[in-house]
Amino acid sequence: MFSELRILRDILLLCFLSVGINAKSSHIEDLDFTDHTNGSPKISRSSYFKQDFRLGYKLKLFCESSGNPRPQIVWYHRGVEVNPDHNRTIRFSIHGDTVSSHLEVDPTSIGDKGEYECVATNLKGSRVKKFLTDYQY
């Protein structure tokens, strides 16, 4: 029991130091306590959490995930799966056990604001990266 408490204390201390040292990790949604040694997806790189866009211009979001087997990425906007259409493009590139995806909305409108999610899934689990978008005039 004491060794489990020490491990938990060390993990919390490491997270605290990481947040204090690296400003990019200061958002709680960027912290990842998942054990990825079993091959479950890991979000390795992504756009920043908060994204502002100008109405009528382009919004670009990026998400990269690795795992074994290689994860599949699905994008959601306000809880609904994003499907490519006249102003939404989704691109993928694959390198070994890593998949990268770009979501592009061009031109943007008021309805494009809100929460987006990049969901990486394989047989061993899922990982979600959230983005919050808002428009400017």
Swiss-Prot record:
Cystine connections: C63-C118
Keywords: Cell projection, Disulfide bond, Immunoglobulin domain, Membrane, Neurogenesis, Secreted, Signal
Annotated localization: Membrane; Secreted, Extracellular space; Cell projection, Dendrite; Cell projection, Axon
Reported phenotype of the disruption mutant: Viable with locomotory defects which may be attributed to impaired GABAergic motor neuron function. Hypersensitive to the drug aldicarb which may be indicative of abnormal GABAergic signaling. Premature postsynaptic remodeling/formation of DD GABAergic motor neurons in animals at larval stage L1 with remodeling/formation occurring 8-16 hours posthatching as opposed to 14-18 hours posthatching in wild-type animals.
Phylogenetic classification of the source organism: Eukaryota, Metazoa, Ecdysozoa, Nematoda, Chromadorea
Protein known as: Immunoglobulin domain-containing protein oig-1
Tissue: Expressed in DD and VD GABAergic motor neurons. Expressed in a subset of head neurons including M2 motor neurons in the pharynx. Expressed in coelomocytes.
The keyword Transport appears for this protein: no
UniProt-listed InterPro entries: Cell_Adh-Cytoskel_Orgn, Ig-like_dom, Ig-like_dom_sf, Ig-like_fold, Ig_I-set, Ig_sub2
